[in-house]
Amino acid sequence: MSTNQELVDEFIATRGLSKASYKSFKYTLKHYSNFQGCSLQELLDEADYEEEQGIRWKKRKLKQRLTNYMNFCRNTLTINTAKHYLKVVKIFYHHHDIEIHKLPPFNERNAKVRNPITPKDLPIREILQEAVEIAEPLMKALILFLVSSGMSKVDARNLTIQNFLDATSKYHNNSEDLKTAIKLMKEYDGEIIPIWNSRRQKTNKFFVTFNTDEATRHIISYLELRNERLNKNFYNPKNELGPSDKLFKIGVDYFSVKFKELNDTLNLGTAGGNPEENIKGFTRLRAHMLRKYHATNLKKFGMDTYTINVLQGKSNGAVNDVYFFEDEETLLAEYIKAIEGVLILTDVKDYNRYSPEYIKMEKENEEYKEKIDKITDEINVLKKMYRGET
């Protein structure tokens, strides 16, 4: 007979889930097993036996167990968490070829709900400035990157040194050596705005986004520090970072811990909780809130929702996703127009956003606009002539 751990490990391995999903699924299945007072193997054997005996669904213990568990979760958890737990349990049964027929619908009346997170819950620029000021080099770079790129923590953690070299290639002549690339970028007279061609782990959707020069400079400082530490570590045969190394060296658990430490140090508290129903809130300074900050502030400074969705790797609808492809340079121009919204340490008046590429792009846009205006004027003249107005 397999233990709970063995069943969970086999279940997770065949589905190819991430470390974070592994922990979530493991906790949920343990929660279900404890509620039922049986091991997962005993629950599977019971369901399998009932199925082989041809017992009708409405009389099966499995239906009663799932219904009872659903009601328990609804009464003790938020409605979204309750639905997620039941979904995981059903997936587990399906994975072991156990049939599950129709269950009673979730009764959402009087269900526990979180208070909505509102714009006032987002950390303001001054708070983020304080956070960056007191943070260690890794967190300085990470905060500025997440705020200005809008990437999720999962996608940011997946980035490699090679991804960084690719994103900044035009600033270091496509150098494949990190130290050489950093040297050239530090000598570059202008703003370094990387172009990230990435893919969301959550949806497998490819997307393009950018980050600010201040984020790039702090990433460079952080990478130099890591290389320096590698050089001083005599027990490590590796003396510099390679293309396959992670851009941000931080585990999923440590990621949350470091943000919570900063949140607590700044006394930011939580958001989205509901004390009356004993629902704890989320820390205000966390990766997802920085993603919200990115979207909210780009919109505040003139960027449309469609473009924001593109930068965050979100869908703009099935038809748009299939038939419309976003041009990197056009997106970059839109990003630079709204960049003030995601600058944390730099005032926009001091920000030389007119890089050589941008100046060229702006000039071409002006010339294009002049041509359009001229054509429009000519069309209007022809219309008047046709009507006999001239």
Show the residue positions of the predicted features.
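Basic, Lys/Arg- and aromatic-enriched nucleic-acid-binding interface segment
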Residues: R125-R157, R291
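Catalytic-site neighborhood detector that most strongly recognizes the C-terminal catalytic loop/helix
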Residues: Q312-K363
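Short, polar N-cap/turn motifs at the start of nucleic acid-interacting alpha helices
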Residues: L165-D166, F282-R284, F301-D327
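Conserved tyrosine-mediated DNA breakage-rejoining catalytic core shared by Y-recombinases
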Residues: L159-H218
